[in-house]
Structures are given as structure tokens and as C-alpha cells.
Amino acid sequence: ELEPQGPPHLGTDLSKKQGPWAEEEAAYGWMDF
């Protein structure tokens, strides 16, 4: 389920980023990617 930003899925993109990036985001805080 790791697609190179193929289909324009904003909702899914956010969910995906909140998964693997959740740890980094929590560590940095300012990183809102």
C-alpha cells in the first residue's frame, strides 16, 4: 500500500502521513507535513 503519490487522495494521503510521520511529527512538533 505504498504508492508513489499516484492517485489524488488527499484524505488517504493525510492518513498515510499521520501514520509513519506521526512519530517524527510528535518529536519535532513544528513539522506539519
Curated annotation (Swiss-Prot):
GO terms for molecular function: hormone activity. GO terms for biological process: G protein-coupled receptor signaling pathway; response to food. The gene is GAST. Keywords: Amidation, Cleavage on pair of basic residues, Hormone, Pyrrolidone carboxylic acid, Secreted, Sulfation. It comes from the Eukaryota. InterPro entries: GAST, Gastrin/cholecystokinin_CS. The modification Phenylalanine amide is found at F33. Gastrin stimulates the stomach mucosa to produce and secrete hydrochloric acid and the pancreas to secrete its digestive enzymes. It also stimulates smooth muscle contraction and increases blood circulation and water secretion in the stomach and intestine. PROSITE patterns: GASTRIN (PS00259). Belongs to the gastrin/cholecystokinin family. This is Gastrin. GO terms for cellular component: extracellular space. It is found in: Secreted. The modification Sulfotyrosine is found at Y28. It comes from Chinchilla chinchilla.
